[in-house]
């Protein structure tokens, strides 16, 4: 019952749009450096297996928390279907009924020897986590 009545931000990074590898992304659904903390509503691969899909009510809660605290954020998908990646722990917590969504910063060249993130995104991620931890049902 405790987990069913809990909310979680699964802190993880998101692959930022890379114009050199544009074929790996859906440009209109990708995360971009310098555009704020990223929320990935759906994570996983191959459809529903080992995946998590945050419900609309939880997305609404997240948006209200971010907007009431002036946190810059973006929503994104992890990349084109079945190109690999996307495994997080969000689905494990969702199995117990917890409201969970992946949240973090966009990373260019993820898992390469040289990764790049935006300092502004890191700052917004910190602000996002503080706002989330201070949120409750009465203030939202």
Whereabouts are the PLM-identified features?
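A glycine-rich helix N-cap at a beta->alpha junction
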Residues: 1-9
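His/Asp/Glu-rich mid-to-C-terminal helical/loop segments that flank catalytic regions of hydrolases
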Residues: 105-140
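Active-site-adjacent substrate-binding region
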Residues: 14, 18-21, 25-114, 136
